[in-house]
From Swiss-Prot:
Renumbered ranges of motif Cx9C motif 2: 244-254
Motif extent (Cx9C motif 1): 223-233
Species this protein is from: Rattus norvegicus
Organism domain of life: Eukaryota
Region Disordered, annotated ranges: 39-59, 81-114, 140-165
Protein location: Mitochondrion inner membrane; Mitochondrion
InterPro entries for this protein: CHCH, MIC19/MIC25, MIC25
Gene from which this protein is expressed: Chchd6
Assembly and interaction partners: Component of the mitochondrial contact site and cristae organizing system (MICOS) complex, composed of at least MICOS10/MIC10, CHCHD3/MIC19, CHCHD6/MIC25, APOOL/MIC27, IMMT/MIC60, APOO/MIC23/MIC26 and MICOS13/MIC13. This complex was also known under the names MINOS or MitOS complex. The MICOS complex associates with mitochondrial outer membrane proteins SAMM50, MTX1 and MTX2 (together described as components of the mitochondrial outer membrane sorting assembly machinery (SAM) complex) and DNAJC11, mitochondrial inner membrane protein TMEM11 and with HSPA9.
Residues forming coiled coils: 109-202
The protein's name: MICOS complex subunit Mic25
Sites of N-myristoyl glycine lipidation: G2
Length: 261
């Protein structure tokens, strides 16, 4: 009899509410805190919802998870709910639920702490990067400002050296051309002297040969007296030249006679 009664007392049936969640347990009375805790357990835990990625730039908001509390279980008296042996299984299930909730809360708390620590480290790293970038920029600007005069002086010195080299090269080229032109001029003068000497020698030889082949002749003027008279007549009678016509005829007759003779 006792074993059959205890077996019947251990049978606990469950019922579903309108939202298909376990709400009513027949054979055991649950306190309001246990019911609320079971409602919370039916929803996905914060540890399951939150899965922070390894990306350094994203910040995942962490939902606030209430701290787990030990549920208070009110066990009815044997006179109301039956034998005490029938109510032995329910507290164990409640403690298991609260223990799972406690572990979920600890996990979410650890995740929250890790995320907070990661965000703090990320902010610190970003601050350090900003400081390093600022220092590098300042150092670069300082180096550029300091190197500008040096670069300018170096550029001017290089330009001066280049112009000096070009001037020396031009002077050397002019000197070489001057020497070349002087040599050419001396050669031309020597050739001209040789040509003049040769031409003079050839001219004298040709003149000597011509003198030896051509006999000299004495030439006397023909009718020189008449020529003098004609010139005097023309000078005295500039406007009456016809008066000198007789002298001109006599001169022509004299020349014709000299040719025939």
């Amino acid at each position: 009899m006792g074993s059959s009664e205890s077996a019947e007392a251990r049978r606990v049936s469950f019922e579903m509410d309108e939202e298909e969640r376990v709400r009513v347990l027949q054979g055991i009375r649950l306190s309001e805190s246990v019911v609320n805790r079971m409602k919370d357990c039916s929803q996905p835990s914060a540890g399951e919802q939150l899965a922070p990625g390894p990306g350094p730039e994203c910040s995942v908001p962490v939902p606030t998870v209430p701290q787990p509390t030990i549920p208070v279980l009110t066990v009815p008296s044997p006179s109301v709910c039956g034998p005490a042996e029938g109510t032995y299984k329910a507290p164990q299930g409640d403690f298991k639920v609260s223990r799972a909730e406690n572990s979920d809360g600890q996990q979410s708390s650890a995740v929250k702490e890790d995320l907070k620590k990661f965000q703090q480290e990320q902010l610190a790293v970003q601050d350090e990067l900003v400081k390093v970038a600022r220092k590098e920029k300042e150092a670069t600007e300082k180096h550029l400002k300091a190197s500008l005069p040096k670069k300018k002086a170096t550029h001017e010195q290089q330009q001066s050296d280049r112009l000096t080299r070009e001037l020396k090269n031009r002077e050397a080229e002019l000197s070489r051309r001057d020497t070349f032109y002087k040599e050419q001029q001396e050669r031309i003068q020597e050739k001209n002297a040789e040509l003049y000497k040769l031409s003079s020698q050839q001219f004298h030889e040709a003149a000597s040969k011509a003198e030896s082949t051509i006999k000299p002749r004495r030439v006397e003027p023909v009718c020189s007296g008449l020529q003098a008279q004609i010139l005097r007549c023309y000078r005295d009678h500039l406007h009456e030249v016809l008066l000198c016509s007789d002298l001109a005829k006599a001169y022509q007759h004299c020349v014709s006679t000299a040719r025939k003779g």
